[in-house]
Amino acid sequence: HTEFKDSELGRIPKSWEISNIGKLTQFVTSGSRGWSQYYSSEGSLFIRIGNLTRDHINLKFADIQLVEPPSGGEGTRTKVKVGDILVSITADLGVIGVVNESLREAYVNQHVCLVRLESVSDVNPRWVGHFLSGHAGQEQFEKKNDGGAKAGLNLPTIRSIVVPLPSPQEQNKVVRVLDRLDSEISIKQTKLAKHQSLKKSLMQDLLTGKVRVTVN
């Protein structure tokens, strides 16, 4: 880009637009309280803050809770769909996840906000997710924390968050680059964890003499 303009987010390319989340969404909601009564050993995924991570914008399921959700409005309202953007709204604020095609039936709990965009052909959910997880998005969450000593974000606050909007084509290109980098980082982190585990095991054996080394 060669031409720039001033905006609420600072200097941005002249061709980009600015919008708050509320203008881009079908709805913004959060899970209901009291769903512990629906906990089950089988059923649907129940997405909690622990299923979100600051490492990337994909969900993580090392620790899962299953539910058998109630029929009717509450179950329908909090059921996630592909492309939904999830935001933690208590405790560790502004942790982001974007629901992808591989996710089974799932619902959000009361500590997670669900943002559903009006048109995913005009606005890529992963563009919004990457932006919200970056510095400019996180700075807005920090400024809008409405809980004082007790961290918290309400739904009107989420709707007020401002995002930049390049063309859909540019959004998609940026998303591909960032997703690829996240994938490469994840692969390397997995390899690193394996090497660290191997080193720990070898240290135990080598430093106690359980495994002998040949000295030339």
Each predicted region: which residue ranges?
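Amphipathic alpha-helical coiled-coil/heptad-repeat segments
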Residues: L9, P164-N216
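Non-catalytic DNA-recognition/assembly elements of restriction-modification systems
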Residues: T2-G31, S160, P168-Q169
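Periplasmic-binding protein-like
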Residues: G137-F141
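A short glycine-rich beta-alpha junction/loop motif
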Residues: I89, E105-C113, R126, D146-Q169
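Sequence-specific dsDNA recognition surfaces
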Residues: F4-S7, G22-Q37, G50-V82, S102
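A short beta-sheet element
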Residues: R48-G50, Q65-S133
